Amino acid sequence: MAGAESDGQFQFTGIKKYFNSYTLTGRMNCVLATYGGIALLVLYFKLRPKKTPAVKAT
């Protein structure tokens, strides 16, 4: 049955220590990184300057 895993059970090093699918903290970090990346993309496209046409049609 799925339960809270202890972090001592898994011996990860490097970036795997923070981003993995075995521990609750690792899964949380993956989700937060994904949501943060999506938020940055939305902000980039929302805040970038609008292109103005070279010649305005009258």
From Swiss-Prot:
Coiled coil: none annotated. Keywords: Acetylation, Membrane, Mitochondrion, Transmembrane, Transmembrane helix. It comes from the Eukaryota. It is found in: Mitochondrion membrane. The modification N6-acetyllysine is found at residues 16-17. GO terms for cellular component: mitochondrial inner membrane; mitochondrion; proton-transporting ATP synthase complex. The keyword Acetylation applies. The keyword Transmembrane applies. The chain crosses the membrane at residues 23-45. It is a single-pass membrane protein. It holds the Pfam family ATP_synth_reg. InterPro entries: ATPMK. Subunit k, of the mitochondrial membrane ATP synthase complex (F(1)F(0) ATP synthase or Complex V) that produces ATP from ADP in the presence of a proton gradient across the membrane which is generated by electron transport complexes of the respiratory chain. ATP synthase complex consist of a soluble F(1) head domain - the catalytic core - and a membrane F(1) domain - the membrane proton channel. These two domains are linked by a central stalk rotating inside the F(1) region and a stationary peripheral stalk. Component of the ATP synthase complex composed at least of ATP5F1A/subunit alpha, ATP5F1B/subunit beta, ATP5MC1/subunit c (homooctomer), MT-ATP6/subunit a, MT-ATP8/subunit 8, ATP5ME/subunit e, ATP5MF/subunit f, ATP5MG/subunit g, ATP5MK/subunit k, ATP5MJ/subunit j, ATP5F1C/subunit gamma, ATP5F1D/subunit delta, ATP5F1E/subunit epsilon, ATP5PF/subunit F6, ATP5PB/subunit b, ATP5PD/subunit d, ATP5PO/subunit OSCP. This is ATP synthase F(0) complex subunit k, mitochondrial.
